[in-house]
């Protein structure tokens, strides 16, 4: 059984607990190496020496930062009491999103899982806006969720994409989920044009995409809507999906990126965002 290496950024809130409960759900079907990461949000001038002591240029009180570090270390230790010694815990210093991205990339994780309070969560350390930044910048797929999904059955996974140029994408995580849960994949493209006029062409492109990416159990969908975000919401109202996967190009102005970020804050579904090749 292949092991999924998962990182859960935590601010010790209930949203971080939701993230862990989601990971537990995945753990029922596949081996998982679980890592919790807490970022002590301090300027770049505050560092740890080789002995783990706080070093600073002086604009921040060393005693204050040391106290915050001690509190965080106790909370991380308590996670092991709550969840078991099989989990790994890490404490790093820096700006929250930058530190999460750097730690994730340097340690080669398969997936980031983040609980978020959505658009109204601006007072939370791990707010919807920070989850959006991770989705935009991370080379590692991000699974975000806004509520407890410990009862989730993964039978239907939605992949939202523009299939006009079928290509082999980096869908390693999705392949692992397919292998573990054997779900039906639903390939969805949203168009502002005529569904009847485009359907045959788009379905042929979807079939080619599925073949290129080793997806065998799938269904094709083309719907008309004013944008991707509304299309995904309306599709979920018609056919209930368990997980929504949507790609982002990571560049400003492309609709997939803005749709991903809006859905993270407004769709009460686990969302996996990942970077596309094109």
Where are these regions (language model features)?
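Small/aliphatic-rich secondary-structure junction motif
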Residues: 1-57, 156-219, 241, 266
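Structural beta-alpha unit
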Residues: 1-2, 41, 78-112, 213-244, ...
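Active-site phosphate/pyrophosphate- and oxyanion-stabilizing loops and adjacent acidic/basic residues
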Residues: 24, 77, 132, 175, ...
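Solvent-exposed polar/charged
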Residues: 25-28, 81, 105-106, 136, ...
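A short acidic, glycine-rich active-site loop
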Residues: 55-71
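Helix-enriched interaction subdomains in cytosolic or periplasmic regions
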Residues: 112-139
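Short beta-strand elements of ligand-binding domains
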Residues: 113-116, 141-147, 247, 271-276
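Charged helix-capping and loop-helix junction motifs
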Residues: 127-130, 201-205, 255-262
